[in-house]
Design a protein with these regions (language model features):
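A composition/biophysics-driven feature that prefers long, compositionally simple stretches
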Residues: 2-5, 9-12, 20-129
Length: 129
């Protein structure tokens, strides 16, 4: 009996660490999201800007959060699954010192200390892929 209990606990701890280390898989692909942003942009009025915000993190109790679920509209247009992000879509091309752009995705930077508590973040490099 003790062997079964030990085996059961070992199985639980090993499976939870495997599941928590998995990466995001976007089955739709970046081209799908890019196409949907372009279709949305074509329907926008002239000289307009659209803002899309990620879903908030919902607290279960003082110490735990519910499993995070991204806002479907935000995910549909961006493919981004992490909290604390903003997608800005411009109808017309904008220009700055770096060139032309018509959309901006604001995301959290990588932070090893916070990742220890909140989980892995893709950061700026992950957003550009």
């Amino acid at each position: 009996m003790r062997f079964k209990n030990t085996l059961f606990l070992l199985l639980i701890f090993s499976s939870s660490s495997i599941l928590s280390s998995q990466q995001y898989i976007d089955d739709l692909g970046s081209e799908f999201h890019k196409k949907k942003r372009q279709e949305f942009r074509e329907q926008m009025p002239q000289n307009s800007i659209a803002f899309f915000f990620t879903a908030p993190i919902m607290k279960r109790s003082n110490d735990t959060d519910f499993m995070y679920h991204q806002d479907p509209n935000f995910y549909y247009l961006s493919g981004w699954r992490e909290p604390h992000g903003v997608l800005v879509i411009f109808k017309d091309d904008q220009q700055d010192n770096n060139g032309l752009y018509n959309e901006i995705l604001y995301v959290r930077e990588k932070n090893e200390y916070r990742e220890m508590w909140d989980g892995r973040r893709l950061g700026l490099n992950g957003a550009t892929q």
